[in-house]
Amino acid sequence: MNRPFFIALDFDEHAKRQRFLESFAAETLDVKIGMELFYREGLSVVHELKEAGYRLFLDLKLHDIPNTVGRTMRALAELDVDVVNVHAAGGKAMMEAALEGLDAGTRAGKQRPKLIAVTQLTSTDSRMLAEELLIDKAMDEVVVRYAQLAQESGLDGVVCSAHEVPLIRAACSDRFLTVTPGIRRQVDQVGDQVRVVTPGEAKALGSWAIVVGRSITAAADPLAVYREMNQDWKGATEH
């Protein structure tokens, strides 16, 4: 799976999503199905997009007791998506159960979906970490520790800010994957994400994959913006 560029399909209507994807008929896309879309359209949207040939990141961020997460992952494995995720804050036992469930649910002859863990949401800042979550460690320290726990649990990688990628790569294996949301163009508004970078900056920092949402989905010309950002992603050199 080569350096994916996932587009987050965060649409509130089926027709809007259809029109959006129709404008990309000439492109081979990687797409992300988040909670909003999955809870609205259910399994049908996964089957529809998989049959259409898209590579899928099913972004449900599971966080529950180990038994529940393990059984859920076993069911999700049958969907044959490419990437799934959990919250690292659920702990090692939960992450290990998630991996066991995926392994058990993956059909013979099929490749197990990559399993990654969310470290901290890109909407989280240091103030929230300290005042609301009562975590008295620096953001970088928390993210790296969660990444190490994910690796120790056998996961394939983590979701993190691109700014944190170099720290994670220094602390974890070279094969450990980093998927970075919070991707914008320089001209875009930041919105509710506080730790953001451009595609080229993410590549230079070592991100394996990026996730882009509103910069493309809310653009007047989504295809043109996608091509611009994808070129920035592909053309950048990893430092």
From Swiss-Prot:
The active site is at residue 61. Substrate binds at residues 10, 32, 59-68, 122, 184, 193, 213-214. One of its GO terms (molecular function) is orotidine-5'-phosphate decarboxylase activity. Keywords: Decarboxylase, Lyase, Pyrimidine biosynthesis. It catalyses: orotidine 5'-phosphate + H(+) = UMP + CO2. Disulfide bonds: none annotated. InterPro entries: Aldolase_TIM (IPR013785), OMPdecase (IPR014732), OMPdecase_AS (IPR018089), OMPdecase_bac (IPR047596), OMPdeCOase_dom (IPR001754), RibuloseP-bd_barrel (IPR011060). Signal peptide: none annotated. CDD domains: OMP_decarboxylase_like (cd04725). Coiled coil: none annotated. GO terms for biological process: 'de novo' pyrimidine nucleobase biosynthetic process; 'de novo' UMP biosynthetic process. Its EC number is 4.1.1.23. GO terms for cellular component: cytosol. Catalyzes the decarboxylation of orotidine 5'-monophosphate (OMP) to uridine 5'-monophosphate (UMP). Homodimer. NCBIfam families: PRK00230.1, pyrF. This is Orotidine 5'-phosphate decarboxylase. It comes from Shouchella clausii (strain KSM-K16). The gene is pyrF.
